[in-house]
From Swiss-Prot:
Designated name of the protein: Methionine--tRNA ligase 1
Residue sites binding Zn(2+) per the record: 141, 144, 153, 156
Self-association and partners: Monomer.
Organism: Bacillus thuringiensis subsp. konkukian (strain 97-27)
GO CC terms, sorted: cytosol
Cofactor binding annotation: Binds 1 zinc ion per subunit.
């Protein structure tokens, strides 16, 4: 089976925060799991280097947009690598390859009659002497009356046009823009109304889209899909490939999602492999992103794919809700966030991954608190999992000189592990990652109970053969926990694999155990709870 996984493209205008990772982490879990299953996986993403936020940041700092994009693209790559993300292709939207692919898609839509020209009114700033792209206009949402940008309201998820906003202001200078006529290209989104409606109905029946994606898309369909501009007067981006319109750029909402397609083509060119199987309609596709990106993946990207006759409507939409920090909404402008480069300097990446999965905002907003993060590490990763691994392997090191005791796998344990693989695999495929991880840790707690009840420290004196059986089965559990947890906690799983000399990485019960255990090291270190206050002081002290 061919599995295509697309992770949303973060804007290269500032550092990643934990909210980004909470929404993107499911993609890596899926990729690791399906590779272990032996499926053909293509997992892509990249940095959005063409968006208005980059141009605004560059203007504020007095540098070029390219300098801003380069800085954060490199930082993103480093962060994703250090968190264990296993993209097959992580690229950027300002590459020549991406520009060519997007222009080809634009021309195909134009040739098929899905794009047309239209004279429209647009916000124009007399002070800055330029037409204002959507994100250059800010004001009040006409639907919920919260602060909003000209392209979308984060509060109610409404897709907006800058002219819809109340109390419009130019983001660059703060002045009130005038309204002037200009010509732009439009995408005939309304012609895909019935196909998108059918896609939502199927998703509702199969449960393959998150509830928030179903509800929001149903709302758009009920209101009637409106044609959307596909060109804008932007300072950076992909030029319109039509004579006389080269100064205009392809609007980022259609250009950025086409990044999945361009990244796929780039991967094919770089590896010499064929990517067509990921777009032939038979592939299982997963699109992983935050709630704010739902309409781009449930309406716009499907319409583009239908318009060019390529691929299928996204089968799985994995759209997490929002992550708050200490019960407050994340705010990058106020510096109310936990920044990824910062937290990676001091904490184990598996600790970060564990907390963001077990507290994932899968169906509702969830909160990151330093207290819960540190207690979660100490009680679950160290106290439950690390403790079971360490005391088992240290027992072998101390009483058997590192030589693996002889034994046979207990039938009940074998059955339990086989059922666990099936249950966890099904949960991952259904994008229920929290359920999957909690199931494994339920088994870890069972393993600790098994160790305590068998009391190998007593068995060693009273019944040496029974003691060997106990320890042998504990190692069997450890080997399989490492395998089951690899999609979630890859770094600690790799350390266990090395200690146990495990070579097989397939998604199946591990029955081959080592003959010897070498270099037993603690799987996790305890985090001093005093760090909670230190981190809170740092967080509150940095607020703007």
């Amino acid at each position: 089976m061919s599995i295509f996984i697309g992770g949303a493209w973060p804007y290269a205008n500032g550092s990643l925060h934990l909210g980004h990772i909470a929404s993107l982490l499911p993609g890596d879990i899926l990729a690791r799991y399906y590779r272990a299953k032996g499926e053909n996986v293509l997992y892509v993403s990249g940095s959005d280097c063409n968006g208005t936020p980059i141009a605004i940041r560059a203007k504020q700092e007095g540098v070029t947009a390219k300098e801003i994009a380069n800085k954060y693209h490199e930082e993103f790559e480093r962060c994703f690598r250090n968190l264990g993300f296993t993209y097959d292709c992580y690229t950027r939207t300002d590459s020549e390859h991406h520009h060519e692919t997007v222009q080809n898609v634009f021309l195909r839509l134009l040739e098929e009659g899905h794009i047309y020209k239209k004279t429209v009114e647009q916000a124009y700033c007399e002070t800055c002497t330029q037409f204002l792209p959507d994100r250059y206009v800010e004001g009040v949402c006409p639907h919920c009356h919260e602060e909003a940008r000209g392209d979308q309201c984060d509060a109610c998820s409404a897709i907006l046009d800058p002219l819809d906003l109340l109390e419009k202001k130019c983001k660059l200078c703060g002045s009130t823009p005038s309204i002037q006529e200009t010509e732009h290209f439009y995408f005939a989104l309304h012609t895909f109304q019935e196909q998108i409606k059918r896609a939502v109905e199927i998703a509702k029946q199969t449960g393959t889209w998150r509830d928030n994606a179903i509800q929001l898309t149903e709302r758009y369909v009920k209101e009637g899909l409106l044609d959307r501009a596909v060109s804008r007067d932007l300072p950076i981006g992909v030029p319109i490939p039509v004579e006389g319109y080269e100064d205009k750029k392809i609007y980022v909402w259609i250009e950025a999602v086409t990044g999945y397609y361009s990244a796929s083509k780039h991967w094919a060119e770089e590896t010499g492999k064929d990517d067509r199987e990921f777009w032939d309609g038979e592939a299982k596709t997963y699109y992983v992103h935050g709630k704010d990106n739902i309409p781009f993946h449930s309406v716009i990207w499907p319409a583009v794919l239908l318009g060019i006759g390529e691929g299928t409507i996204p089968r799985h939409i994995v759209s997490n809700e929002y992550l708050t920090v200490e019960k407050r909404k994340l705010s990058t402008s106020k510096n109310w966030a936990v920044w990824v480069p910062d937290i990676l300097e001091r904490y184990d990446p598996d600790s970060i991954r564990y907390f963001l999965i077990v507290n994932a905002p899968e169906n509702r907003d969830t909160d990151f608190s330093w207290r819960e993060f540190i207690y979660s590490h100490n009680s679950e990763l160290l106290g439950a999992y690390g403790n079971f691994v360490n005391r088992t392997l240290k027992f072998i090191e101390k009483y058997y000189g590192g030589i693996m005791p002889k034994g046979s796998i207990d039938v009940e344990l074998k059955d339990k592990i086989e059922r666990l693989y099936k249950h966890v695999g099904e949960a991952i495929e259904q994008t229920k990652f929290k359920v999957a991880l909690e199931s494994i840790f339920d088994a870890v707690r069972f393993a600790n109970k098994y160790f305590d009840e068998r009391q190998p420290w007593k068995e060693r004196e009273d019944d040496p053969v029974s003691c060997e059986e106990t320890i042998y089965n504990c190692v069997y559990l450890i080997a399989n926990f490492a395998n089951l947890l690899e999609p979630f906690l890859p770094f600690s799983s790799e350390r266990i694999r090395n200690t146990l000399s495990i070579v097989n990485r397939n998604w199946e019960p591990q029955h081959t155990l080592p003959s010897r255990i070498d270099s037993v090291q603690p799987l996790f270190e305890r985090i001093d709870v005093k760090q909670i206050e230190c981190e809170l002081e740092k967080l509150y002290g940095a607020v703007k």
